[in-house]
């Protein structure tokens, strides 16, 4: 699964996800892409599950680009532990996704396979998405 090799700080504030994606809202690599329509935290496990669903449907043909990276540590305290006594330890890594962000791109397969692969990937994610197609061909 994806996670940073090293970070400046071990733990991070929760924060909020405001506004639309400034960058990463256009297709840069592939012909088909999966674009987020709402703000949400996407975990490294969800990204990996979506990637596996896509590559499995494409039968190892074509190419998949993952345009998001889980760089936010999410902490949690163990079960049945009282409040206080500091912040919990890092449980998993997540990526804050804003609306308009292209998360995955596909190329090298036909239209039907690409759309179905992206639909299967979208099922694994906790947000509403839309399949986008490059128009300048």
From Swiss-Prot:
GO molecular function per UniProt: rRNA binding; structural constituent of ribosome; tRNA binding
One Pfam family from the record: Ribosomal_L16
Superkingdom, taxonomy of origin: Bacteria
CDD domains: Ribosomal_L16_L10e
InterPro entries for the chain: Ribosomal_uL16 (IPR047873), Ribosomal_uL16_bact-type (IPR000114), Ribosomal_uL16_CS (IPR020798), Ribosomal_uL16_dom (IPR016180), Ribosomal_uL16_sf (IPR036920)
Function: Binds 23S rRNA and is also seen to make contacts with the A and possibly P site tRNAs.
Quaternary structure annotation from Swiss-Prot or TrEMBL: Part of the 50S ribosomal subunit.
HAMAP family given in the database record: Ribosomal_uL16 (MF_01342)
Protein family membership: Belongs to the universal ribosomal protein uL16 family.
Name of protein: Large ribosomal subunit protein uL16
Species in which this protein is naturally found: Ruegeria pomeroyi (strain ATCC 700808 / DSM 15171 / DSS-3)
Lineage, highest ranks first: Bacteria, Pseudomonadati, Pseudomonadota, Alphaproteobacteria, Rhodobacterales
């Amino acid at each position: 699964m994806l996670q940073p090799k090293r970070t400046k700080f071990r733990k991070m504030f929760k924060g909020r996800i405001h506004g639309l994606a400034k960058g990463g809202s256009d297709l840069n690599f592939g012909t088909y892409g999966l674009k987020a329509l709402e703000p949400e935290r996407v975990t490294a496990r969800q990204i990996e599950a979506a990637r596996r669903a896509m590559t499995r449907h494409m039968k190892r043909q074509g190419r998949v680009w993952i345009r998001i990276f889980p760089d936010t540590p999410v902490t949690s305290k163990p079960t049945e532990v009282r409040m206080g006594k500091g912040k919990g330890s890092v449980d998993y890594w997540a990526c804050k996704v804003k609306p308009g962000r292209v998360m995955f791109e596909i190329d090298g397969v036909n239209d039907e396979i690409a759309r179905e692969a992206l639909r299967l990937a979208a099922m694994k994610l906790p947000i509403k998405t839309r399949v986008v197609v490059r128009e300048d061909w």
